[in-house]
Amino acid sequence: MSSKYPRSVRCCLPLWALTLEAALILLFFFFTYYDASLEDQKGLVASYQVCQDLTVMAVLGLGFFTSNLRRNSWSSVAFNLFLLALGVQWAILLDGFLSQFSPGKVVIKLFSIRLATRSTTSMLISMNAVLGKVNLAQLVVMELVELTVFGTMRIVIYNIFKIDYGMNMMHIHVFAAYFGLTVAWCLPKPLPKGTEDKYQTTTSPSLFAMLGTLFLWMFWPTFNSALLLNPIERKNAVFSTYYALAVSAVTAISVSSLAHPQRKINMTYMPNAGLAGGVAVGASCHVIHSPWIAMVLGLVAGLISFGGAKCLPVCFNRVLGIHESHSMHYTFGLPALLGEITYIVLMALRVFWASSNMIGFQVLLSTGTLSLAMAMSITSGLLTGLLLNLKIWKGPHVAKYFDDQAFWEFPHLAVGF
């Protein structure tokens, strides 16, 4: 017999979502208008192609990437689309209001959609840590809080540290990963015996997760270069991301076979380590001028991701009390920290080679922005986790974790689904 979505949530979720959408429509009506400037057709087409690539990554890539659980795949794909559609609207308004201090309407350009899509990606990453343990109403609340805090953080970095929007977006993986992990830490942790089958993977869901990985792998160079305005930096970002992804993919397959007693490849670790290179190189891809640096970074990121996914879950699940079924920490968190540290080292070396006495200031600046991103992600994640624990949201009971039957109608419910 299928589990029932709580009556209170069944009543309030449509009302809550439609009311929020109506409020967004009113805000767009009163405070926004389209950019009326005449752009050349070639530039417009190129800009739209970047938006299209980012949307494919978010919808297909991240949607299927989290569909590896046998009883939670429907929610993974559909909730991802819902949150992306809602989050882009909120992010466009938020970025417009925060970036202009004088009163006036927000001008919507293709770059605005590009920036909003990348900002919303932070929520789609964080969602991996809590997916299956919260309902859709809780995810909407989590999204509104995270996008607001993330947008505020970028404005603070822009105004205090004088780092433009393209550069301060490099903290997205660190912020998203540790925001999501902190929220997951606040949620009810014990999983009752007998429900382990719900968060086990099977062949078909794992294949869909690998399909999402392929979409992410193909379009990750666009993701890392989407907000860079300097043509040279954009070219460096594309090249560096490709080489880092290539090496991390080779590393994922090779190390997976090496670690298996019978030298077989384990599909479980492929999505994690295969993408780790793109995550790790994201912070420094625009300042890397030689392929070998990106390749070494991809190799180390792949090893860290594989080692973390294979050895650290016991520590996370039992010691820290964080049950993380989608390996988000090993795909985004640890590789992103490696990338941030690499960026700090590269910037320090650049200043040193230039015979400048500003090396200490540059290291302090880079370390300060990373520390701010970590502090704001953990603090806001803690507050969000406490907010999601309120009974008003009617979160799913631990016995109903990772179960699509709590949210979806199945025309013919098969035994053992």
Curated annotation (Swiss-Prot):
Pfam families: Ammonium_transp (PF00909). May be part of an oligomeric complex which is likely to have a transport or channel function in the erythrocyte membrane. Keywords: Membrane, Transmembrane, Transmembrane helix. GO terms for biological process: ammonium homeostasis. The chain crosses the membrane at residues 12-32, 44-64, 77-97, 125-145, 172-192, 203-223, 238-258, 265-285, 287-307, 331-351, 358-378. The keyword Signal does not apply. It is a multi-pass membrane protein. This is RH-like protein. It is found in: Membrane. InterPro entries: Ammonium/urea_transptr (IPR029020), NH4_transpt_AmtB-like_dom (IPR024041), RhesusRHD (IPR002229). Belongs to the ammonium transporter (TC 2.A.49) family. Rh subfamily. One of its GO terms (cellular component) is plasma membrane. Its main location: membrane. One of its GO terms (molecular function) is ammonium channel activity. Signal peptide: none annotated.
